[in-house]
Amino acid sequence: MTLLFKLVKIAILVFLMVIGFFIFIGSFWLNTYQTAQWADLLASSDASGIILTIFPNINSWFNATVANQPVLFKTMVHFFIPVGFGLLFGLIIAIIVDILYRLTKYAIKRSYQSN
């Protein structure tokens, strides 16, 4: 039973990471949820979402990172930087939800012990 519980918990955390990833790429980086356009937008354009409000210089940093590199490297980095940030954002969301779950579970357990 504990193995099944752990697998379900891992599946839920992966699901939360995917949701966080979609939120980051859709809202923060590209400002669109039309996933069919994501590959073209990631390869050709800079960030255009909410992230520009939070970090106004991110496009200049992003372009300076790949300025003197070969075309293949530029193409890979145009995908990996936003995807990496998206996965990190998803991981943070999953960790926060896990912490809130554990705190709620602890609070419920404490309330039953005090009665």
Swiss-Prot record:
Q: Which organism is it from?
A: Mycoplasma genitalium (strain ATCC 33530 / DSM 19775 / NCTC 10195 / G37)
Domain of life of the native organism: Bacteria
The listed locations are: Cell membrane
Transmembrane residue ranges: 10-30, 47-67, 77-97
Bilayer topology: Multi-pass membrane protein
One Gene Ontology cellular component term attached to this UniProt record is: plasma membrane
Instruction: Provide this UniProt record's keywords sorted from A to Z.
Output: Cell membrane, Membrane, Transmembrane, Transmembrane helix
Q: Which InterPro entries match?
A: MPN454_MG319
User: Per its record, how is this protein called by name?
Assistant: Uncharacterized protein MG267
